[in-house]
Amino acid sequence: ATIRRQRQMCIRDSIKRYAKEEDKDSFFPHVTLVSHIDSEETALKILNKLLVKKSTVIFDRVSTGDTYFQKVYLESSDNSYFFNAVSKIEGWPSLWVPHMSLCYGDELPKSFDLGELNELIPITLTFDTITVYKTGPVVSEWKEITTLLLD
């Protein structure tokens, strides 16, 4: 359990370090299920569709992308937990790929080291909360709308 906790802290520390290097706001580790939620009413409708229990997911791949919100991120080979949740919300998952972002930006962070990040995986994380945020490009402006604790 100690090694797992250390790896989880390394994920959080990586997010903070990358944000500081790039002069950006840090964010809490998370997986985005859907976007364009801007009211508590919409959030509650979505949460009512989700009768999900907490789940453990193993992230086993580090990836880099071309978009601002998918610059450096972790992926799981088994995305069924996320796809099942998104299917309940949207009916059919879009081209979205479930991931846990480590860095937002137009370019890779200065200290990006794939080898260092690969030492963190596989990492097992338990998802026990769904929190809905009104988000945008400026992380410091994100506002929590509501939270659901999972059984």
Spans of model-derived segments:
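Intrinsic, low-complexity N-terminal interaction/targeting segments
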Residues: 81-90, 94
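Short, recurring structural edge motifs at helix starts
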Residues: 15-21, 117-119
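Extracellular/lumenal glycan-associated surfaces
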Residues: 25-36, 94-106
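Flexible phosphate-binding patches that engage nucleotides and nucleic acids
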Residues: 44-68, 95, 101-151
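Short, conserved charged micro-motifs
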Residues: 8, 39-45, 81-84, 108-114
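Hydrophobic, ordered structural segments
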Residues: 16, 78-81
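Short, charge-patterned binding micro-sites
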Residues: 21-37, 52-77
